[in-house]
Amino acid sequence: MSNENDIITPGMQDYINRNNSYLAKRSQYIQDEVKKWKFDTIAVHGLYSVTDAINDYQGSIIEPIFMSTSQAYRDSDEMAAALAYKIPTWCYSRIANPSTYYYEWTLALLEGYGFDGETTCCSTSSGMAAIMTAVQPFLHVYNTPAEPRNFVATAQCYGGTFQQFSIRLMQERNIECRWVLDATNLDEWNSKIDENTRFLYGELPSNPQLSFFDIKAVADLAHSHEIPLICDSTIATPALLRPISHGADIVVQSVTKSLTSSGFGIAGAVIARKNLTSKFSDDELKEDFALNVKLLQNRDFGPNLHPLQAVMSLNDMRTIRSKMDLMSRSTMKIARSLNSHPQVESVQYLGLPDHPQHELASKYMWLVDAEYDELYNKPVNRYGHLMSFCVKGGAEKTRGVFDNLKRIWRATDLGRIKSVATIPAISTHQQQGEEGRKKAGIPANMIRLCVGAEHPDDILADLDQALNAAK
């Protein structure tokens, strides 16, 4: 972001010096104070302090919502320094906003919890915007427009991701996506990589199949080829899984889902480790990926998050650990019950011992800070609140079960405080076609269930009556 032709006036330098001092103090505060906090404390407070509130925001306990398009400056020197990205101001809400800063700082700290290095975050208007924000910088043309470019991704992924990769990138831009069908097979990953591969991409746990892969092994493979690993861990949230601690370079979150469990809006985020691995990128991008894409790429594309939504999502995040614990426990109970139901063909849930990736997921998916809880006093596995099950009798019978649900909401959403179900083949994954669904392992008789905070017995009763009514 620096430019050797920039002219720094004495007045600009004064602003730069003052802001460098501010950044150094904030960094020291994070190291001396925030990094010592438990996960829940970070989720509740982030970097919004009592001092900030009293000195700057008339004592507001909740982060203020800045409903302003742009920022005013004291003089031309401050404006010039700001627009040259020499000082950390927000300039214009298409680029940044004080409300989104608090959102980003909190998510960066949560995804980086337990990680020795630094993490930064770029907010986006949706999860799909987060995915494009994360992958686009690695797909630049460096020599000629005809140069071959490819990337490797898990076939078990969200339907929107499949569309973005297969249609927007492959068909429209001739950038090849090489699908990995068995993400647990490291040889398959390796066989797809060549000198033109820009990054590896994986979703875990995947939606709706609940597949998983070995993050550290795939990250090591990526780094051996000098390319980054990008992970979508929306389903787990940082309360259960933080891929950066296991070697991933970048994490994308559809904050719309579990992190904004109230359902009050659409939001996304890209969280990256500093000094990530990539032989294709410039040094400034690698040094601070999230900040770089925020100030350059996304300034031009415009997928920034609305400040009102930033604070609303931030308030949902404060209790994410407790919610994921509660809903994971409920999902485990429901999955166990459905696993022996006479009308159910199979159940897909990572918490079940008979799931093919149960042992692998158990290495990575833990309720953060459970060892400090009086209730547990030890590390405990939690596998999230998304599960799927296949109904005996085929697609028509499955739709009958689905249509007979009374308490569970029929919708394409997930991550809600209320339980929601859908049939992926006719909704979230219908656009990728039968061949694409077969590749991803999504049969017509699959129902995806995202368990909310209701008592699990009431959800089980609704499922049981729906399964029996459709006999």
Regions found by a protein language model. Give the residues of each.
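Alpha-helix N-cap recognition
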Residues: 74-76, 111, 126, 455
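Conserved C-terminal alpha-helix-loop-beta "cap" of PLP-dependent enzymes
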Residues: 45-55, 344-447, 451
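Short amphipathic alpha-helical segments
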Residues: 88, 119, 266, 308-309, ...
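Hydrophobic side chains in well-ordered alpha-helices
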Residues: 134, 397-401, 459-463
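Conserved PLP-enzyme active-site core in the AAT-like
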Residues: 2-43, 48-56, 110, 116-342, ...
